[in-house]
Amino acid sequence: MTQAVKLASRVFHRVQLPSQLGSDSVLRSLSDIPGPSTPSFLAELFCKGGLSRLHELQVHGAARYGPIWSGSFGTLRTVYVADPALVEQLLRQESHCPERCSFSSWSEHRRRHQRACGLLTADGEEWQRLRSLLAPLLLRPQAAAGYAGTLDSVVSDLVRRLRRQRGRGSGLPDLVLDVAGEFYKFGLEGIGAVLLGSRLGCLEAEVPPDTETFIEAVGSVFVSTLLTMAMPSWLHRLIPGPWARLCRDWDQMFAFAQKHVEQREGEAAVRNQGKPEEDLPTGHHLTHFLFREKVSVQSIVGNVTELLLAGVDTVSNTLSWALYELSRHPEVQSALHSEITGAVNPGSYAHLQATALSQLPLLKAVIKEVLRLYPVVPGNSRVPDRDICVGNYVIPQDTLVSLCHYATSRDPAQFREPNSFNPARWLGEGPAPHPFASLPFGFGKRSCIGRRLAELELQMALAQILTHFEVLPEPGALPVKPMTRTVLVPERSIHLQFVDR
């Protein structure tokens, strides 16, 4: 990502104006955008716990400076946009290959350790090529629905594991400690089955050591990412800990993915030995498809590693928050349980999950409301490849623009009682919000490629869990707030009771 900010005095000769901008509107420059001073901005980040409160800083910034403001960190100036209409205006001006703020430390790891970039770290034409390969297998609803049978057995194993974990270390017979940890295992098992076509053992009574190492690395890499991104690169030599930790985490994840990809490659070679290409069997997992497309092993490993990471956090955090909120709103849980049991035959989940469950309005509304309150990625970004206009401001080419999705999804102008869990708001109760107010999966070409798969996993998991259990809060537990760890996570462990129905 180019980090240089263009001078405010530049001539605006390549500005793309929005159609709604009136001819009498006055264009203003980057230097006219309000925002905190650099010392104040840095104090908020490093002296007041701002790195773990980045989502809250979005809300505070919008309240203090309005829908658009800017802040500087060294030579890098970031423009923050916290109004859904302005977010839409910016995203509608995307180029053929939209560029977002790259996780520079991730890209640097790939370069130094000679690893291939996957869909999360690739840019430009390489990103476009990978996206074009993977999108038909993940983004089309019918393609995602094809994994229902695979995921059904994973969800059934999750239910069995929750039964085993009840009462362990808690003194309460139905209490499961740290449900997010259990759902991390579920998320990895599910995405692993889709990507690799094999089970990883995450939900067994004894989890394989390399799987435990991978799960720990996923949690650790987001913490080290925040630290390394906040530090200038020259500081990595003086304070080597965060960078060394990030490299260790990524190396462990790459080793895990490489081991399983090579196993699939070896199995395919034995199975297909001596057969002409037209007679080779078709596989249903993504690694098989990438091999057939003659993608290099190094590139397959890079993509599998990054997709495993993305799949784990999206499902585990959203499922944790969903059951947390449902446990605190028993009337919603009861209504959802009735909707599920009234529409689905528990004996035929694998056949009905992708069809019947996706048509249940309250189930979809619960997931949508959870993602509004707790978007996995609280903010997104774009780096325009030309001068663009956002509101009445000209944003120069190569300026980092942060889209404050957490702030827009809790905007009282868009959502009545925005901090309250109310799935009914998505069922026609009250005025409809701006369509860009809540964008948990992003928008356009850079939208989350695993959206359909994540929604399917969440629907299937909630359906089976609520069919088997009534979920209750931990007795006497205080409310749990979110915190930023690159992604949005619970600030402390969530413990829940799973009572047999």
From Swiss-Prot:
It is found in: Mitochondrion membrane. CDD domains: CYP27B1. Its EC number is 1.14.15.18. Pfam families: p450. One of its GO terms (biological process) is lactation. The keyword Translocase does not apply. Heme binds at C448. Disulfide bonds: none annotated. Pathway: Hormone biosynthesis; cholecalciferol biosynthesis. Its cofactor is heme. Keywords: Heme, Iron, Lipid metabolism, Membrane, Metal-binding, Mitochondrion, Monooxygenase, Oxidoreductase, Transit peptide. GO terms for cellular component: cytoplasm; mitochondrial membrane; mitochondrion. Its main location: mitochondrion. Kidney. It catalyses: calcidiol + 2 reduced [adrenodoxin] + O2 + 2 H(+) = calcitriol + 2 oxidized [adrenodoxin] + H2O; secalciferol + 2 reduced [adrenodoxin] + O2 + 2 H(+) = calcitetrol + 2 oxidized [adrenodoxin] + H2O. One of its GO terms (molecular function) is secalciferol 1-monooxygenase activity. Catalyzes the conversion of 25-hydroxyvitamin D3 (25(OH)D3) to 1-alpha,25-dihydroxyvitamin D3 (1alpha,25(OH)(2)D3), and of 24,25-dihydroxyvitamin D3 (24,25(OH)(2)D3) to 1-alpha,24,25-trihydroxyvitamin D3 (1alpha,24,25(OH)(3)D3). Is also active with 25-hydroxy-24-oxo-vitamin D3. Plays an important role in normal bone growth, calcium metabolism, and tissue differentiation. Belongs to the cytochrome P450 family. This is 25-hydroxyvitamin D-1 alpha hydroxylase, mitochondrial. It comes from Rattus norvegicus (Rat). The lineage of its organism: Eukaryota, Metazoa, Chordata, Craniata, Vertebrata.
